[in-house]
Regions:
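Carbohydrate transferase catalytic cores enriched for Leloir-type hexosyltransferases
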Residues: 1-138
């Protein structure tokens, strides 16, 4: 299975003590896990929306994600983005999140961005979209 390949790679790279694979985490425990991270790295090539990015931002964690899908919409302009499969770019972006002034801005603006995605706001926007479709507004 792929998880075994990842664990083998981490061991060969000497990262087995720095990378943790978590499974079956209850939703209520996610904020504490996010808040224990230095940076949330999400180089996914395809996602339906990117809810984990919003969870990280809401937890005050800087985000580094891939370009080319919905992740930029989820993460907003104060997250960092790299091309998929750009290993050097990913490493550089992760390192940038440790720069104190950039990190502070990413955290502050990320928290503000995440507030735009409340359940109430999403429901309002969805209903407005349906209204426009049903009344044929464009």
């Amino acid at each position: 299975a792929y998880i075994h390949q990842l664990k083998e790679f981490m061991t060969k790279a000497g990262l087995q003590d720095r990378v943790h694979f978590l499974h079956g985490i209850p939703s209520d425990d996610l904020p504490a896990i996010y808040q224990s991270a230095e940076t949330f790295v999400y180089p996914s090539v395809y996602e339906g929306f990117g809810i984990p990015i919003l969870e990280a931002l809401h937890s005050g964690i800087p985000v580094v994600a891939a370009t080319g899908s919905c992740l930029e919409e989820a993460g907003g302009e104060h997250s960092l983005y790299v091309r998929p499969y750009d290993v050097e770019g990913l490493a550089a972006a992760i390192a940038r999140t440790q720069e104190p002034s950039l990190r502070a801005t990413m955290i502050e603006e990320g928290l503000k961005w995440a507030q735009r995605f409340t359940e109430e706001q999403m429901a309002r926007e969805t209903m407005e979209c349906y209204r426009k479709v049903l009344t044929k507004e464009t």
